[in-house]
């Protein structure tokens, strides 16, 4: 928890007392993708440093947002994971991420930090089409060196790091730019397949089309005046 406080009864201020320290929300962002070992959190957030990461994790534990756990066999390694209270941050933080999509990029933003799994994480907040809550499936994506999967549980998609632990309905491979264009509806699944920018390793074209029909970002409608003032981040999502 932050050592400084706004000292206000306002629930937004009290939330920031817990979440307002630099890096805290990004640590939570990584845990939204599933349980993580300390070294994997450090690799995902290289600029945070070992001591600061340990401090932020202690703060999240003290606040009841994250906890230590051990992965089941055969892994049986210590990890950090979100608690039920931590999971309650999923919707508000992903809504914040979607809001951030419309912020202009500047020279301080490193395009090399774009990650497909974080794009997918943001995409899960765009689901508007209902899906049968009885379906339990996974969809695996291999985007460059990044491997992640989308779980379909209780009618909702969740993005998770790494390969699917169960046999996926769909496994596809593509590059980061292609995935970005699919996510932003700048490219259709059928066109990506036609242009050989996507390879289906397992599954069907129908499954691929479904993912990007149910999950895809549509920019907000702007008036002519607003469009002139707003500068879209060129090239796609930077999560």
Q: Residue spans of the language-model regions?
A:
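N-terminal intrinsically disordered/low-complexity leader segments
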Residues: 1-8
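N-terminal helix-turn-helix DNA-binding core of bacterial DNA-binding proteins
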Residues: 10-49
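Basic, amphipathic "hinge/linker" alpha-helix immediately C-terminal to the N-terminal HTH DNA-binding motif
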Residues: 20, 72-95
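Basic amphipathic alpha-helical segments that dock to polyanions
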Residues: 53-63
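Amphipathic alpha-helical dimerization/coiled-coil segments
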Residues: 91-140, 147, 222, 226
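C-terminal interaction segments
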Residues: 165-239
């Amino acid at each position: 928890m932050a050592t400084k406080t706004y000292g206000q009864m306002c629930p937004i201020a009290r939330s920031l007392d817990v979440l307002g320290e630099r890096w805290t929300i990004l640590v939570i962002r990584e845990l939204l993708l599933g349980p993580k070992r300390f070294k994997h959190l450090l690799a995902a957030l290289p600029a945070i440093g070992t001591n600061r990461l340990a401090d932020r994790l202690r703060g999240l534990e003290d606040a009841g947002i994250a906890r230590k756990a051990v992965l089941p066999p055969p892994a049986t390694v210590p990890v950090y994971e979100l608690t039920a209270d931590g999971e309650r941050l999923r919707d508000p933080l992903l809504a914040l991420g979607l809001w951030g999509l419309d912020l202009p990029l500047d020279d301080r933003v490193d395009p090399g930090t774009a990650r497909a799994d974080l794009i997918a994480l943001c995409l899960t907040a765009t689901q508007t089409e209902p899906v049968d809550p009885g379906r339990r499936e996974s969809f695996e994506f291999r985007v460059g060196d990044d491997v992640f999967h989308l779980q379909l549980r209780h009618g909702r998609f969740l993005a998770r790091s790494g390969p699917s632990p169960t046999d996926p309905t769909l496994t596809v491979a593509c590059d980061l730019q292609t995935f970005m264009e699919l996510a932003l509806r700048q490219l259709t699944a059928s066109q990506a397949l036609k242009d050989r920018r996507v390879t289906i390793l397992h599954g069907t074209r129908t499954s691929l089309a479904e993912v990007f029909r149910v999950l895809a970002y549509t920019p907000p409608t702007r008036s002519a005046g607003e469009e002139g003032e707003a500068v879209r981040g060129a090239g796609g999502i930077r999560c």
